[in-house]
Amino acid sequence: MAFGSLLLVVNVVILAVLVQQRFFSGDKLESSLAKDIDPTYDYIIVGAGSAGSVLANRLSIDSSLKVLVLEAGSDDQQPSSTVLKVPMMCPLAQRSEYDWQYSSVPQKNCCKGLKGQRMPMPRGKVLGGSSQINYNVYVRGHRKDYDDWSKAGCDGWSYSEVLPYFIKSENIKPFKNMETEYHGKTGPLGVSESQITDFPSFMIEAGKELGYGTGDYNGREQKGFFAAQATIQDGERCSTAKAFLWPAIISRKNLHVLTNAHVKKVVIKNKKAVGVEFYHKGTLKSVSVNKEIILSAGALSSPQILMLSGIGPKEHLKTHGIPVVADLPVGDHLQDHITFSYYYKTKDLVFSSFNKTQSLWSLAQYLTTKTGVLTAPGGIESLAFITTDPKTPEYPDLQIHAVHLMTNEEMLHDIAALDLKYADHVSGIGGINGFILVYTLLRPKSHGTVRLNSTDAMQHPVIDPRYLENKEDMDSLLRGVRFSQKLATTKTFKSQGTEFFHKPFSPCLEKSNFDSDEYWRCYLGYFNLAVYHPTGTCKMGRTEDPTTVVDPQLRVKGIHGLRIVDASIMPSIVSGNTNAPCIMIGEKAADMILGIKPPKPLSNM
């Protein structure tokens, strides 16, 4: 084991023990979870993730309603769950016991530098779901995203109509450039600005040189360079389990949450959802419902459960011998955000480094005050939303996640699943001072699918995102390369002796000259990562639209008493990280289910 990895392991162990002693109250919380369940409930929620936890809280407010949540993962109160609580440690939560550890099928147009050409696709398998293992970044998306949903037939989902639900959830810690009218101060979800070092100011100044402003990207204008907003409260991750689920579990007897409950299928009789079959402790069990079943298992698992229940593409279901209940395009329209990373080295130790993150001083600072670099969400302190497509000058097409430190070879191999035959290309990266800019394609034109691997619910589905299948996606990433090079020429970057860190890549040099468009098109097909935002596999829209699975009320077409409430319903992927939109979807769905009149649209904002 390399020295860096050994030091990291030692520090994680120290941190786990000390944090457990100082902050842990797991036994008390765990005792509130259901040990067994009743035969029947009014509502059954499958999945306690970003949207499911919100639903569980809102539906159980009425003490006359019995609500059951079935979560395939464990609770988040185990000693090992320390890795979930400390914001800087989020990379270690992925590929852990709290992750489904999905991977795509081999990709034709990207991932050539990854093991088996497969994209890792982390998804949270724990109370709180992916809000527990993501990078905490809080982005709502662009107002045009939601207005386009509305124009496409999703009545009630325009920006002015969904904004009140974003505000409802939020408990923002005020920051310098905050546009107050766009934020909430009384909701359960803790949100704060991530500004630990001078790195956000550095990025903002560089952006100004290229004509970009700053402010509040969750306010009136998304375009610009900013300090990141994150679901971090008092130095700890604020997952939806912490914000919404645990307070309800502890205080409400009508809410039952069963962990390690892996759903096999929804039971449907005469086009009505009447119950759920699930595995718990190795035994197949069933539970009935009086009102509705809500799938909130995410854009990869919800379509799998639907297809196992007989709802999906007819020919695919027949291939697996599953009786067809409803012929719907379940699992189609998969969209995800793909990235490439630009590495910069600096003359001096300007912001932070991987070694500093591992230092005992950082640990001591965090444990005594819950401040310092360990509160930075995966090192992300700054975001930018830039426009490189002349056809949409005010609608950002790329997002930059700016990470204030360098990674090292071990982290790249572990998290990115780098193919070892390309190890020399990243050798030495951990020994330099610098930072990383991760460019994210916001509106990919490429669409993929989720399909069944077998009729065994315990097997992972077949996930084929078809990244970069559409040429326009590669064109967008190439424009990002050129923008990144332009950033390096700014006075701000030059003031710190900033240089682009890139070893010319031999397989691409064999085909083209270094720094040519052809070189970068080749390179961008090797070292990609996703930011793990799968969406769209149970698409929302007009009932008569043959590409949709749910109507604007999130009801599965042709099936009574069954809704989908998660990222899978998005008709098109949002321009940014998907956790905040999923929470909004949960809030809005709760009002729909309970028949509560929606808040007045905020049309003047």
What do the PLM-derived regions correspond to, one by one?
Residues 2-605:
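N-terminal redox-cofactor-binding region of secreted/periplasmic oxidoreductases
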